[in-house]
């Protein structure tokens, strides 16, 4: 039994930046440091930050006055930003710059009183934050998830000639393309972003799974169940005909998965650390894997700076 390791996998630049922001804030300002929502969707990472003094909350009313709060990588609505400002909370923004790009697209469309369609999953914090960028009283913003959702928009959209679409950054590339095709069919004049909203890391990790799924008998995806991009990797493997399993830790592995397997694929979502991947590999070796081969893939060199305040403090 052999393991094929996907490349690229694991942390993306946005996740790396978000975690660094929490770590530096803890070092410089001392705990507790409050974080609105899980800074990234990974249980291993969140538990580690909790042990160091981070306190994760869902709403700003859980943050005491005169404290620091960090916004998660998924972004927040303008209403949340305004609330933090009114309470004079010290804010460090860990929103992924690629999510911020989508926020700016929505805000720009809102100022032009265009209607906006967001392709995304209801209830996901990134979707809530993106929807919360829209402020036009005369337009409207609508959420769709599947191509079948698009037809119902015909009764809602006021001006099909003044319509714009954006998407959640962590979706399935193929499924998003299907929704966009349907939007363009139903609304021929709809406008979209100059560059695809699906983030580079989401695209690259899905491409790596496509390569791996053709070769392996089983695909193991390291990531938490509330991680959108990790879930999409599992779903993609299954769509390509390979059994996929999404796991948070080595203890989640069922030896039965590998009974008839000769090649096991392993990848990790953008919020899963390499330390956790190594633990998973060790467990699969205990179950009989004799070697690990890393598959060649697209090289990533993206890097996002942390806020200047934390950079300056670190120098001092």
UniProtKB/Swiss-Prot annotation:
[4Fe-4S] cluster binds at residues 12, 96, 199. Belongs to the IspH family. Pathway: Isoprenoid biosynthesis; dimethylallyl diphosphate biosynthesis; dimethylallyl diphosphate from (2E)-4-hydroxy-3-methylbutenyl diphosphate: step 1/1; Isoprenoid biosynthesis; isopentenyl diphosphate biosynthesis via DXP pathway; isopentenyl diphosphate from 1-deoxy-D-xylulose 5-phosphate: step 6/6. NCBIfam families: ispH_lytB, PRK01045.1-2, PRK01045.1-4. The active site is at residue 126. This is 4-hydroxy-3-methylbut-2-enyl diphosphate reductase. It comes from Vibrio cholerae serotype O1 (strain ATCC 39315 / El Tor Inaba N16961). The gene is ispH. One of its GO terms (cellular component) is cytosol. It comes from the Bacteria. One of its GO terms (molecular function) is metal ion binding. The keyword Metal-binding applies. InterPro entries: LytB/IspH. Isopentenyl diphosphate binds at residues 41, 74, 124, 227-229, 271. Disulfide bonds: none annotated. Its cofactor is [4Fe-4S] cluster. Its EC number is 1.17.7.4.
């Amino acid at each position: 039994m052999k393991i094929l390791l996907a490349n690229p996998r694991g942390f993306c630049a946005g996740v790396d930046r978000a975690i660094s922001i929490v770590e530096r804030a803890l070092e410089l300002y001392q705990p507790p440091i409050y974080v609105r929502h899980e800074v990234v969707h990974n249980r291993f990472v969140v538990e580690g930050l909790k042990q160091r003094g981070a306190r994760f909350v869902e709403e700003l009313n859980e943050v005491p006055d005169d404290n620091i709060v960090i916004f998660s990588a998924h972004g927040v609505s303008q209403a949340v930003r305004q609330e933090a400002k009114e309470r004079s909370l010290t804010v460090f923004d860990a929103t992924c710059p690629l999510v911020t790009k989508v926020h700016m697209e929505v805000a720009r469309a809102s100022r032009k009183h265009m209607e906006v369609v967001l392709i995304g999953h209801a209830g996901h914090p990134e979707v809530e934050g993106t929807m919360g960028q829209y402020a036009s009283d005369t337009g409207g913003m609508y959420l769709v998830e599947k191509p079948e959702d698009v037809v119902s928009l015909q009764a809602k959209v006021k001006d099909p000639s003044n319509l714009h679409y954006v998407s959640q950054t962590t979706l399935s590339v193929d499924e998003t393309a299907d929704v966009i095709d349907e939007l363009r069919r139903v609304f021929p004049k709809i406008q979209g972003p100059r560059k695809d909203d699906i983030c580079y890391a989401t695209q690259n990790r899905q491409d790596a799974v496509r390569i791996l799924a053709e070769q392996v008998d089983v695909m193991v995806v390291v990531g938490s169940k509330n991680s959108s991009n990790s879930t999409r990797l599992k779903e993609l493997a299954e769509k390509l005909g390979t059994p996929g399993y999404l796991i948070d830790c080595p203890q989640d592995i069922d030896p039965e998965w590998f009974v008839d397997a000769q090649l096991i694929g392993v990848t990790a979502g953008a919020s899963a650390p390499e330390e956790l991947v190594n633990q998973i590999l060790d467990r699969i070796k205990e179950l009989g894997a004799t070697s690990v081969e890393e598959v060649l893939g697209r090289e990533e060199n993206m890097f996002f700076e942390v806020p200047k305040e934390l950079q300056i403090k670190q120098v001092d």
